[in-house]
């Protein structure tokens, strides 16, 4: 996972397990955790590809229930303005 701080590694690994089991093909960390600005109170920003759209909110609920730290989940396949901007401008660290 590159430069991800150890305090986040356990939660990111757990999120990766949940996402993979749901069929997600790729996962990236972005934001403060990815660029080294995170603090103990930071959330984890995850960007994903390949998750069937009908599973997005189910998986988001599982992440919220099983990981104590707040998670923001962005679907890079949804074609939204934000996901396009994220792919163009944001540094992302690949998880899987």
Where are each of the predicted segments found?
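Catalytic core of pol beta-like nucleotidyltransferases
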Residues: 1-28, 34-40, 51-96
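Periplasmic OmpA-like peptidoglycan-binding domain that tethers envelope proteins to the cell wall
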Residues: 42-44
């Amino acid at each position: 996972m590159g430069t991800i701080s150890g305090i986040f590694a356990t939660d990111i690994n757990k999120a990766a397990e949940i996402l993979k089991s749901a069929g997600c093909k790729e996962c990236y960390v972005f934001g403060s955790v990815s660029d080294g600005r995170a603090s103990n109170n930071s959330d984890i920003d995850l960007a994903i590809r390949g998750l069937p759209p009908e599973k997005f909110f189910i998986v988001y609920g599982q992440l919220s229930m099983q990981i104590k730290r707040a998670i923001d989940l962005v679907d890079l396949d949804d074609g939204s303005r934000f996901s396009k901007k994220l792919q163009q401008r944001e540094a992302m660290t690949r998880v899987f």
